[in-house]
Amino acid sequence: MLRWLTAGESHGPALIGIVEGVPAGVELTSGQIRDALARRRLGYGRGARMKFEQDEVTIMGGVRHGLTQGGPVAIQVGNTEWPKWEQIMSADPVDPEVLADQARNAPLTRPRPGHADFTGMQKYGFDEARPVLERASARETATRVALGTVAAQFLKQLGIELVSHTVSIASVTVPEGRPLPLPKDVIALDADPLRCFDRETSNAMVAEVDAAHKEGETLGGVVEVLAYGLPPGLGSYVHWDRRLDSRLAAALMGIQAIKGVEVGDGFLTAARRGSAAHDEILKDENGKIVRQTNRAGGIEGGMSIGEVLRVRAAMKPIATVPRALRTIDVSTGEPAKAHHQRSDVCAVPAAGVVAEAMVALVLAEAVAEKFGGDSVPETQRNLQSYLESIPATLDSVGR
């Protein structure tokens, strides 16, 4: 069983992630994690923080000489801006007079619409939003990307690879029927300003971001994650919480600012007749059982079917809007403009990288449940044995 947990605040000394249940023998280095975190900072329309924010990665346990050891893997992502926040975010009590001299410590009493600020203050009894936004911040996703790197490395050694890309920015959308990116296309994808696989659409997306920036607006969009090389049978139909699509949806909805998830053709399927909504099961000239379409996105009945997994996540426009939204100053009870420090115009490309990490964690957990071994070679043998045992052709069904 794969379990993971993160801790830390946006402006704290570091973020911490721990993942347990990783078999021995997964190839992992701090450089691979740094590369993944660098991808999280990609994207046209990002704010100033991406320019000065550096991710200092330290593997604290569970890895020796580039290989996992079978124990929990602990990763620390250090905050290079910590010296500026050391007094304000100190875990130990600080002299109030010292804090009073620091402008950064001004109480955040104007909660931002669309954020966790106000409800978090109500729930936990805070008189300002700082304690809420420090943990609710999307900065926490750096740890998820780090842990997702561990999961992705494990999956890769089993022949499973993931790709994420941007499908839409605001109303600018990749036309239906365009080719899907493959694992070999990741470098080219990451070089694109919006991580979009269609150049013409990418150019239109850049123009959309520029227009929003001039107008003091923010933009959302849709990202898609593809998983290649999955065997059939991950997940289960026997309970709702074991369904692979259920677990993927929960993981993606747990990403900050994600407001919708679909698997395969998703909501488009609801507008179709039944005869055009499903993937018929056929046989090819060799008698191999195949599906000519993949409208289901690689999942039927809560289980992977051996086709390409395809899931999408819709990200709302960033809630910290430069042209500040209306709110109430909780210290006075009077109408006010919401607090605004700095923000991105568009963070959809980064959301794709985070979504990719979350899908990797879910799939790694499902693989460990089905084929789990104490080491990578044992897991590989279990997977190979399973693949050899399931019918691939009509001649072998029932044997």
From Swiss-Prot:
PROSITE patterns: CHORISMATE_SYNTHASE_1, CHORISMATE_SYNTHASE_2, CHORISMATE_SYNTHASE_3
Comment on bound cofactor: Reduced FMN (FMNH(2)).
GO terms under biological process: amino acid biosynthetic process; aromatic amino acid family biosynthetic process; chorismate biosynthetic process
Keywords attached to this entry: Amino-acid biosynthesis, Aromatic amino acid biosynthesis, FAD, Flavoprotein, FMN, Lyase, NADP
Annotated residues for binding of NADP(+): R40, R46
Keyword Lyase: yes
Pfam name, any one: Chorismate_synt
Catalytic activity annotation: 5-O-(1-carboxyvinyl)-3-phosphoshikimate = chorismate + phosphate
InterPro entries for this protein: Chorismate_synth, Chorismate_synth_AroC_sf, Chorismate_synthase_CS
GO MF assignments: chorismate synthase activity; FMN binding
Cofactors that this protein relies on: FMNH2
EC number from the UniProt entry: 4.2.3.5
Function: This reaction introduces a second double bond into the aromatic ring system.
NCBIfam families: aroC (TIGR00033), PRK05382.1 (NF003793)
Subunit description: Homotetramer.
Protein name: Chorismate synthase
